[in-house]
């Protein structure tokens, strides 16, 4: 979010859970008008303390925000859980105001830890993380770009969260790059 602290923003978070991201926005942008969509009723009730939260499934495409359009729509580790992430992005794009942006955090299945496990014959789901057992879709950097293009969105700023990458991981990535057409090591993070 690049506006000044006093900007009167309209922000919508899809899958807002208990509202932690929306609370961060409110703390940094006190004039922001906050909205959320959350499928879990208990979490929606909590988030409703700081935002106008609609309890429901965004994929049913029946949201009514009273004609309000948004400066930002946030998808924080949500798209990989949806049956139709592209359709949902297209639907939500209709709620953006002119010049509005979608902010998304999407796990990279081409992460060095997943690739290392794959070449050793493992693709083990977990209760959280890159291989969360509730993920329906998996994306690589290139697949994220393709999905955005198909939905008529443009990637303006993409950043990789490089957490817990060891020197051994970096050396492994260098070897992978020698074997592949990938020329940007960040695609493995």
Residues covered by each model-derived region:
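Conserved SAM-binding loop
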Residues: 2-116, 140-145
């Amino acid at each position: 979010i690049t506006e000044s602290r006093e900007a009167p923003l309209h922000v919508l978070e899809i899958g807002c859970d208990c509202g932690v991201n929306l609370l961060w926005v409110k703390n940094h942008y006190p004039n922001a008008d906050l909205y959320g969509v959350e499928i879990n009723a208990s979490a929606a009730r909590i988030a409703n303390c700081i935002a106008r939260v609609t309890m429901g499934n965004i994929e049913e495409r029946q949201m009514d925000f009273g004609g309000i359009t948004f400066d930002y729509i946030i998808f924080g580790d949500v798209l990989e859980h949806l049956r139709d992430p592209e359709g949902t992005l297209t639907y939500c794009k209709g709620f953006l105001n002119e010049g509005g942006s979608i902010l998304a955090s999407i796990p990279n299945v081409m992460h060095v830890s997943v690739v290392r496990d794959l070449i050793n014959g493992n693709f083990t789901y977990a209760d959280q993380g890159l291989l969360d057992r509730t993920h329906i879709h998996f994306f690589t950097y290139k697949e994220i770009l393709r999905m955005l293009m198909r939905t008529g969105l443009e990637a303006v700023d993409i950043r990789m969260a490089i957490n817990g990458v060891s020197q051994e991981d970096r050396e492994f990535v260098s070897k992978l790059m020698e074997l592949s057409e990938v020329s940007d090591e960040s695609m493995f993070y």
